[in-house]
């Protein structure tokens, strides 16, 4: 498995506080990876650096086989390269239907209002149907997004990211606020997607991560503390001390 993204000796400080400290880390393609760590460990800052929201003070972030330096790119340019990010709170158009939300997000150069009046092609219709099927919302295409359950809104936003054909998805705390059934369905969705994409999941819910069955990276004080299966890192004495609190 080749690396899709490599973070090489990256550091960043805020007002003297080193949020990321000489961090080196990578994810393969395709791969599902969970990132855990206590508050202030650097999880969000790492995601911000990958997506260009925060610029590193030093080090490199390299993308794909040709090692494109992401630290020299804008957020927009990074997104266009194939990196999509979903925050904890869903960002959807609640007054539009599920179908319209997906259409709006399709990879094209049309604006919001132009998209709503645009008569999309048969190929685009097929793509919308495929995405709806993937996120288990086919029967709800005509429903207003604001009327969906919390879990369904999360899936819709993932579908909106999928419409951009990303190679890497960054998913922030997907399990928060979900019912048990929704959490189980989300686990299956992420596992299915990881067969053809790389996915980074930042999550606090250990049961959710265990069900993902993927490699886990533990961050602490801006560096990698441990990596391996959830069972492996849970037995690491340093991890127990700084994260699990046992």
Which residue ranges define each predicted feature?
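Conserved structural motif at the start of ABC-family nucleotide-binding domains
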Residues: 5-7, 20, 27
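Helix-to-loop junction immediately C-terminal to a conserved catalytic motif
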Residues: 51
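ABC ATPase NBD coupling module
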Residues: 55, 68-90, 114-122, 193, ...
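Conserved ABC transporter NBD signature motif
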Residues: 59-69, 81, 173
């Amino acid at each position: 498995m080749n690396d899709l993204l490599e973070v090489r000796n990256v550091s960043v400080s805020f007002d003297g506080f080193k949020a990321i400290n000489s961090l080196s880390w990578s994810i393969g393609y395709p791969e599902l990876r969970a990132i855990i760590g206590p508050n202030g460990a650097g999880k969000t800052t790492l995601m911000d650096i990958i997506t260009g929201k925060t610029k590193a003070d030093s080090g490199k972030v390299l993308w794909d086989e040709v090692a494109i330096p992401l630290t020299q790119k804008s957020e927009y340019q990074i997104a266009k390269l194939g990196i999509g990010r979903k925050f904890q709170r869903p960002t959807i158009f609640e007054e539009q239907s599920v179908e319209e939300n997906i259409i709006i997000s399709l990879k094209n150069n049309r604006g919001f209002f132009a998209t709503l009046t645009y008569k999309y092609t048969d190929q685009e219709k097929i793509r919308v149907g495929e995405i709806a099927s993937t996120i288990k919302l086919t029967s709800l295409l005509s429903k207003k997004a604001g009327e969906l359950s919390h879990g369904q809104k999360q899936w819709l936003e993932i579908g909106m990211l999928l419409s951009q054909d990303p190679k890497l998805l960054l998913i922030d705390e997907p399990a928060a606020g979900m019912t048990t059934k929704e959490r189980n369905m989300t686990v299956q969705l992420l596992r299915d997607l990881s067969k053809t994409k790389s996915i980074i999941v930042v999550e606090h819910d250990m049961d959710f991560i265990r069900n993902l069955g993927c490699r886990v990276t533990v961050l602490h004080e801006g560096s990698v503390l441990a990596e391996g299966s959830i069972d492996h890192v849970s037995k690491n004495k340093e991890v127990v001390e700084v994260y699990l609190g046992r």
